[in-house]
Every structure is written in structure tokens, then in C-alpha cells.
Amino acid sequence: MKKNKLAFVDVETTGIDHEKYEIIELGCILVEQNWDAAGQPEFKVLDEFEFKIKPERIEQADKVSLKINGYNEPDWLEALSLPDAMRIFADKTEDAIMVAHNVAFDFCFLAKAFSLTGVTNKMHYHKLDTISIAFAKLHLKEGVDRFSLQFLCDHFGIENKKAHTALSDCRATLELYKKLMQI
């Protein structure tokens, strides 16, 4: 039986450009994926966590982005510094394959954060993107004309109660991944 450790990751940010904006929330669910003798996937959640991260340049934030992800100063008073968050994240995700919905977006922000803090990224170099997997499996399916996390959650009947919060989006991405692996 082949085992893989997967890190379902989501970042919430102060804008969409990783060169200009910063991470304000980081969520992760660590999962062991096994394949049984019949080739069916099995999933075991090992850990899950979410950090609010103190923004250093909140005055430069995109107001629309802050509204979407629900940023408000009082909720971030006890937030971690970026270096502290990245150290914990790196230790917890060691050797895990990163999985995200639009993995390039999340990884660009993480790579910048690792660089800024001097923390070493310990994740496996392979990454999985649920948008790419969904496109490969569903692009010819009638009625599937978008690949946003919300659209695909609706399509598969996955509830995402707190969309655009890091841990909730991680949970939705994990459930989406499970559905896609069944196809």
C-alpha cells in the first residue's frame, strides 16, 4: 500500500499580487493518503491548524480583499508574526505534498514568506492543484463551465460554511479532492 502525506493549504491575503501584498491567514490540514489493494483512496487526517498573521503593511492592503476574507483589526490583535507562523508551518508540513485550489497563488505567497523570513520550506517539491485535477476530469462534463472552489463545491454538494477563511477553504479543498479521486 502506497502512502503519501498531503498538506491541504490555503492562504488569505491582503491582495492578489504576491509581490505587493501579504499573508494574513494560513490554514493547513495534514492528511495521510493511502491506496487500498483495489486502488481506492483512503484518507486519515493527521493534524489541522490555522494561524492569523499580523500584517506589516495593512495600510497598503486592497480593501476588497480585506472585505472578502473578513479582516478586522480586533481579530488580529493576538496574531502571530510572519516568522513565527512560517517556522511552525515549515515544521508541521515537512515532507508533505502541498495541495491547494489554484496552488500557484498560494505557493507564490508562501515562497515569498519563506524568503522574507529566512525559514526553509520543508515540504516536498511536488504540488497538486485541485483546479487542474478538476479540469482534467470534468472539462467535458455538461454544466461544468467554471472551476472556482465555490462552483465545484456547489457541483459536488460540499458545504463551505466560512468561505474565504483559510481553514474552511482547506476543508472544502480536501473534500473536493476526495470527490475528484473517486472519478
Residue ranges of model-derived segments:
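Acidic two-metal-ion nuclease catalytic site recognized across multiple nuclease folds
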Residues: 154-155, 161, 167, 171-183
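Ser/Thr-centric signal marking residues that sit
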Residues: 11-14, 130, 173
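A structural motif
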Residues: 142-152
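A short alpha->loop->secondary-structure connector
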Residues: 114-125
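Conserved protein kinase catalytic core
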Residues: 16-18, 135, 175
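Short alpha-helix plus adjacent loop in nuclease-associated cores
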Residues: 128-143
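Conserved non-catalytic scaffold segment of RNase H-like nuclease domains
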Residues: 2-109, 124, 150-158, 164
